[in-house]
Design a protein with these regions (language model features):
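Short, isolated positions in well-ordered beta-strands
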Residues: 213-217, 262-263
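Short, charged/polar surface micro-motifs in flexible loops or helix N-caps
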Residues: 100-101, 190-191, 215, 220-225
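Low-complexity, glycine/alanine/valine/leucine- and proline-rich hydrophobic stretches
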Residues: 224, 229-262, 269-270, 277-280
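Active-site proximal loops enriched in glycine and acidic residues that flank catalytic Cys/His/Asp
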Residues: 210, 219, 266
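Short Gly/Pro-enriched turn/cap motifs at secondary-structure boundaries
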Residues: 196-198, 206, 242-246
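Short acidic-hydrophobic surface loop/beta-edge motif
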Residues: 183, 206-211, 253-258
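One-carbon transfer enzymes
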Residues: 1-204, 259-263, 269-274, 279, ...
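A structure-centric feature marking long, well-folded core domains of fungal metabolic enzymes
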Residues: 14, 107, 216-223, 230
Length: 316
């Protein structure tokens, strides 16, 4: 509310959530580096001294009393093309479900419910092939920042042109629990496993069972990108989901899914092992006679975890 002819924002303060990290969340570290005042939720700082509030992946419902402190309300920068993927983990679900188009929505915050307010500005974005959650997050963050600046430059006009969200096409993006990282070999296709890895693999490495022990799988590849793989599989129809082969030329483990096969470059058992080391240490004896045969005992099995365990959501 301090007039300025040159600056779009003349005064800025930051509210962040509590964190167990020594330095707090990244947004707090950034604010401190820029010497901005920082308040920790539920403390929201001075009352009635700001024109507009902005939240991004904040994860807390704002009261009507708090929203009314801002003459222009509170804006939310949401990384999806609403009403698709309302909720705390929209980018994860965009990748998980194989969406080819997403976007960013600048919307007006309403009390008591998440992501239901009117749309102020919205832009679509084509999801790049093979994109991960982390990569898409970086792209949409920059896109959202530019859109927010555009809205703030013409705030009264932007608010006048806001529109309610469509009632159709609503989907929800709930938090993802660590149980989601367990590959269900009998239920998931190769394409679904690859998408799961791209969606949560950088935060929750995918997990399975090997001879009763939990192992983590990393560095997945599509078998279409492995030259000569099709020639190796002779009894494809007989392979039980979870069955393993080793492709020597590319040094890749190949696991059977509900449909198709998926390549794996790294296994974490007691320590991180390359596929060739895992093969030499744990699989070699089965394949001495034929590297092409699928052995029923040589397989991963589905690990079951409680969904109530640790959860993941996108938050700054």
């Amino acid at each position: 509310r301090e007039p300025s002819k040159d600056l779009l924002v003349s005064r800025l303060e930051v509210v962040t959530l509590p964190s167990r990290l020594p330095r707090g969340l990244p947004v707090k570290s950034c604010a401190q580096e820029l010497q901005l005042p920082v308040h920790e939720w539920p403390n929201t700082g001075p009352v009635g001294q700001f024109d507009v509030g902005v939240v991004a992946s904040f994860g807390r419902l704002l009261s009507e009393d708090l929203i009314l402190q801002f003459p222009y309300g509170v804006l939310n920068v949401h990384p999806s093309f609403l009403p698709r993927w309302r909720g705390p983990a929209p980018i994860v679900h965009t990748i998980l479900h194989g969406d080819t188009v997403t976007g960013v929505t600048i919307m007006e915050i309403r009390p008591k419910r998440f992501d239901v307010g009117p749309i102020i500005k919205q832009e679509e974005f084509a999801v790049p092939p093979h994109c991960t959650t982390k990569e898409l997050e970086e792209i949409l963050a920059k896109m959202g920042a530019n859109m927010l600046l555009s809205v703030l430059k013409h705030l009264p006009e932007s608010l006048e042109n806001k529109k309610e969200q469509p009632k159709g096409g609503v989907t929800f993006a709930p938090k993802v629990s660590v149980a989601k990282s367990c590959i269900k070999w009998e239920e998931q296709t190769a394409a679904q496993v690859i998408r799961l890895h791209r969606a949560i693999g950088s935060m929750f490495p995918l997990q399975t069972l090997w001879k009763g022990s939990p192992v983590k799988l990393m560095d997945f590849v599509e078998v279409d990108n492995i030259p000569g793989f099709a020639d190796q599989v002779l009894n494809d129809d007989e392979a039980v989901p979870g069955s393993l082969l080793y492709h020597k030329a590319s040094q890749t483990l190949i696991a059977r899914c509900k449909e198709g096969w998926v390549g794996i470059k790294t296994v974490v058992l007691k320590k991180k092992l390359r596929a060739v080391d895992f093969y030499n240490g744990y699989m070699h004896s089965w394949f001495q006679q034929s590297s092409r045969a699928v052995h029923q005992e040589c397989r991963f099995q589905t690990l079951r975890l409680s969904p109530a365990k640790k959860t993941l959501k996108e938050r700054n």
